[in-house]
Amino acid sequence: PMLKERVEILNVVGTKLVDSYEGDWLNFIKNGPRKLYSNGEGLVERLVLEFPRFNDSSIYLDKEVNFYKLAQLAFWGIHGELAHTGYFRIEDMESMTAFADYIVPVALIVMKITQYSDELEDKIMSGKMIERDSSEEIEIRSASIYATAKLTESVNRRRKDLESLIIPQLDYRLWKHYHATHFPHHLTYTTMY
């Protein structure tokens, strides 16, 4: 879906990458601290500033809500590939949130951790579109971030002598398992997730 928009995004990102970083993401990474957030200089902060495509933000009750799903996911992938090599390791991975998308909310609903209002559930079950930046969409995504953080805390309390999980690890487990289900998820026309 949205192929034309996605091609345009890739062209814009590619042009910026070539113009500013010799076409190499590693040059972008090397150009700042090895942190996601660092007083405006962190990897996610720079990515959403320099590549507006990654600036996944919404306004809710007159306040900006930053989801940064794809920005965080990009560095989660890079970290996963390079951390074990010693070449690149993000120092503040614990500051990463869940990747607010379509699937994690389904996992949380099926597990009875969260629930929708009757009206919202009817919309989702009947396949009605949830508008991008609507209160409903922002609340679904925000609730999934909050609930996943709380679930991670709960799991870690039970793992006393084991290495603690970080939120993206739990997010992946939820996503992987529930991605294959046929339980309806919310539908939003967006390239942000």
What are these regions (language model features)?
Residues P1-Y193:
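HhH-family (HhH-GPD) DNA N-glycosylase catalytic core used in base-excision repair
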